[in-house]
């Protein structure tokens, strides 16, 4: 009985990780299912749509959600927020929803109305806000449910469609995402009595912080998602779908661990930070990331060789190797980002954003003129992430000194 209780207690403590893992596994399988059941161009359109909602989830509140995280006070299990944040949050979410939807509809031939897309975009932004509010309250399970419910729902709906009709179309996918986000909104009722507003922040401070965070979010979003928009514009929707499929197989597993590291290590660095600890963790994460990359490549070889699933490993080996290298670099970045998130002030944030923007502006013309293949584009992406890692590391060294 004691063992059973310990097991239940362990599950309760780490259930948020189970939800995170379930959502990530569902998303992984969703992309594989849709690759097999959607037409190549529709899969490319699905890829750009997922990129769009991921992008809007990142900076849909124009940096104000980071102001909430930085300045919120937790007392008696309640979140105390500044009243001055209300209008900026409402305005930014509506503005981004309308502008983002307008740009998407005008650039991509997707068979949904602009009103429907505005609604989805607005729900995506609110979902990320709900996630952050639950996270502030240390309700990690609820935060992960809010963030991952649409992935879990979509996976089960796709299973039903495949088993019953053996037919899946893009409209079914988008409609399922919409209704899953609508259901997620009911989690707001769990926050109504937990969030209180007080006048404790000046508007000038709120907007100055939001601008700094927005710059940071734009730079990270640009190198996180910009490659997909570039590949679509340079090589077309079908090639984007092809690329999206391979990043799902060979980069997404790294991103899953990257999210976990960011989730865990920022708390560790807030409790105690020093350079020796950082170097020790960097060596460890580099070693295990390389080993994981070797495992991923070996596992894929056996899957392809034994014909469990057709990956065309050798035909795409150069691109796959570049994606694994990118995954290793992003793992290192996730640790540096956690350390920076734990100790940085506005001055440090401004510097790293400035250096990052300069490096991106220098490389953009080079990427534009020399990216003749998807593999070369990934190589430039690795360079961008490596430069970002160097910038972060140098700033952390200055902090220590």
Predicted regions and their residues:
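Transmembrane helix-bundle signature of multi-pass secondary active exporters and lipid flippases
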Residues: 50-58, 243-259, 263, 292, ...
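Signature of the first transmembrane helix
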Residues: 6-62, 211-238, 244, 248, ...
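Helix-loop junctions and terminal segments of transmembrane helices
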Residues: 27, 31, 60-76, 250-274, ...
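Interfacial segments at transmembrane-helix termini and the short loops linking adjacent helices
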Residues: 40-42, 103-117, 300-331, 375
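Hydrophobic transmembrane helix module of multi-pass membrane transport proteins
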Residues: 87-215, 325, 329-341, 350-355
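Small-residue-rich transmembrane alpha-helices that serve as helix-helix interface/gating elements
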Residues: 171-185, 246-249, 324-325, 358, ...
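Membrane-water interface segments that mark the loop-to-transmembrane alpha-helix transition
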Residues: 12-23, 49, 54-104, 112, ...
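Alpha-helical transmembrane segments of multi-pass membrane transporters/permeases
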Residues: 13-24, 79, 117-121, 134-160, ...
């Amino acid at each position: 009985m004691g063992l059973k209780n310990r097991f239940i207690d362990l599950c309760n403590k780490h259930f948020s990780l189970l939800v995170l893992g379930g959502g990530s596994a569902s998303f992984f399988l969703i992309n594989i299912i849709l690759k097999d059941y959607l037409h190549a161009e529709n899969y490319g359109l699905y890829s750009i749509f997922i990129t769009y909602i991921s992008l809007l989830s990142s900076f849909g509140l124009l940096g104000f959600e980071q102001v909430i995280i930085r300045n919120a006070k937790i007392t008696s299990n309640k979140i105390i927020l500044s009243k001055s944040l209300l209008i900026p949050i409402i305005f930014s979410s509506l503005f981004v929803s309308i502008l983002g939807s307008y740009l998407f509809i005008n650039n991509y031939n997707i068979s949904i109305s602009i009103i429907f897309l505005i609604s989805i975009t607005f729900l995506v932004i609110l979902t990320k806000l709900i996630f952050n509010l639950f996270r502030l309250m240390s309700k990690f399970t609820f935060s992960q449910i809010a963030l991952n419910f649409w992935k879990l729902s979509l996976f089960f709906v796709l299973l039903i469609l495949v088993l019953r009709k053996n037919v899946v179309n893009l409209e079914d996918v988008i409609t399922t995402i919409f209704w899953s986000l609508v259901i997620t909104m009911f989690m707001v009722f769990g926050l109504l009595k937990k969030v209180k507003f007080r006048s404790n922040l000046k508007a000038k401070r709120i907007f100055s912080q939001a601008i700094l965070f927005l710059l940071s979010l734009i730079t990270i979003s640009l190198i996180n998602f910009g490659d997909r928009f570039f590949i679509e514009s340079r090589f077309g929707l079908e090639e984007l779908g092809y690329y999206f499929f391979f990043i799902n197989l060979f980069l997404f597993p790294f991103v899953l661990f990257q999210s976990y590291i960011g989730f865990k290590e920022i708390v560790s660095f807030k409790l105690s930070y020093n350079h020796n600890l950082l170097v020790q963790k960097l060596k460890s994460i580099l070693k295990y990331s390389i080993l994981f990359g070797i495992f991923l490549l070996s596992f894929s070889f056996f899957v392809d060789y034994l014909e469990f699933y057709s990956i065309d490993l050798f035909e795409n080996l150069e691109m796959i190797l570049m994606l694994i290298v990118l995954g290793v670099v992003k793992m290192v970045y996730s640790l540096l980002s956690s350390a920076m998130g734990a100790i940085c002030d506005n001055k440090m944030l401004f510097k790293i954003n400035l250096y990052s923007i300069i490096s991106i502006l220098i490389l953009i013309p080079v990427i534009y003129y020399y990216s003749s293949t998807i593999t070369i584009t990934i190589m430039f992406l690795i360079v961008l992430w490596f430069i970002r890692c160097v910038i972060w590391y140098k700033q952390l060294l200055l902090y220590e000194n």
